[in-house]
Amino acid sequence: VKVETMAGITTFMTMAYILAVNPSILGQTGMDQRAVFTATALASAISTILIAFLAKLPFAQAPSMGINAFFAFTLVKGMGYSWETALAAVFVEGIIFIILTAFNIREQIVKCIPLNLRYAISSGIGMFIAFIGLKNAGIIVSNEATFVTLGQFTPTAILACIGIVVSGVLIALKVRGALFYGILICTLIGIPMGVTQLPDGFIPVSMPKSLDPTFLKFDFSSLLNMDMALTIFALVFMDIFNTVGTLIGAAAKTEMMDEKGNVRHIKQAMMADALATSVGAALGTSTVTTFVESASGIAEGGRTGLTSFTTAALFILALFFAPLFLLVPSAATTGALVMVGVFMLDAVPKIDLTDVSEALPAFITMITMVLTYNIAEGMALGMICYTLVKLLSGQWRQISLTLAIVTVKKEEEASLLKKIGCKCLSVVELYLPLQSRVWRGAPEKTLPLVHLG
């Protein structure tokens, strides 16, 4: 019991930064940060309890880093939807995930995205998250001549730079909870610098803030169009890969894997994740998913649901310390955002750079996510590039039918390519006649998974 409890505490310390970062990111959409904090803590606690009792595994869940950026900067700021519509999309995504898990359809979605594109998507999201951190701190600013440039060294930018260095040093020293401590140190340093605003009569403990500003604030009226359908698919895709990749990666080489290399009770864990996403959206936060930081608790000896239950209890306790977490300035979270980006770049060496037909789509995916400031467009351009290059280089057998159908329909392709000044025949029109003649002789290959952050 002692080992499991300590493992749960370790997991919480390594992922507690989400309590400061998530309200900061979602708050930029106009959502009430205090309500988002409560939603984040409650959703994390409820989802982690679900995985403790349904799957009896030592994993913890919370709003996903990466998908929260997709929610704020692609759905709301990029595509112009309200945050209420974005929450509705997340809720629907959770329902779809529940259905896919119940009927074991998720394997087909896993198969449809080529391995190197999975690595590229993971790394691209990491670069995007780091760019958000640098931009929010004013380290990188817009420029009419060069598009972006180095900003002025304001107190906010200086504090963010300190945070990057402090977080990097703590991680290099293998300090448990390095990102959390990095945020805490920068918040304290920010007080004399005038960046951290300490209100008069500050009390660090209070009753949990109300969920009224975000609870069940859904707007389903804008969901019935093709753009939103593709967006929901992207959310489902990222959630599935994030969850399955984390479960397999963190459970590797432990008794949680069976003799076939599968995670025990993985279906129950996936169902807990799917339920948590819809519950989280109802409370007022972006997609909830299994956190890779769960590996820290597993490394400390956590093997059962007691580890998860301990982590969930600490998230509930954190509800009463909202003033402390909401005191954190956005500059203090820059170090955490940049380091998360660094962690997600570990997929880059796995990309096959010796094959241009694999390397080019991967590169397009990563660079366009950052330069378009849009995760969805980066994913779409990468998939279109992959399909075109493979098709025109005579490697069309490597394109799955599913990939062709879900990535390049006439309407989506025309809308996306119009933005970059190109016109092109529908790849589906070119590809399907070829595929139909060889489909029976070209089965899809099951590919390994990759964590998407």
Language-model-derived ranges and their functions:
Residues 79-192, 196, 309-411:
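Membrane-embedded alpha-helical modules
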Residues 30-49:
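Loop-to-helix transition at the N-terminal end of transmembrane alpha-helices
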Residues 1-22, 43, 64-125, 252-347:
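Helix-loop-helix junctions within the multi-pass membrane cores of secondary transporters/permeases
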Residues 422-424:
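Cysteine-centered motifs
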Residues 1-35, 149, 181-267:
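Helix-loop-helix hairpins and the membrane-proximal interhelical loops
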Residues 45-65, 96:
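Juxtamembrane transmembrane-helix boundary signature
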Residues 418-420, 445-446:
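Polybasic, lysine-rich low-complexity intrinsically disordered segments
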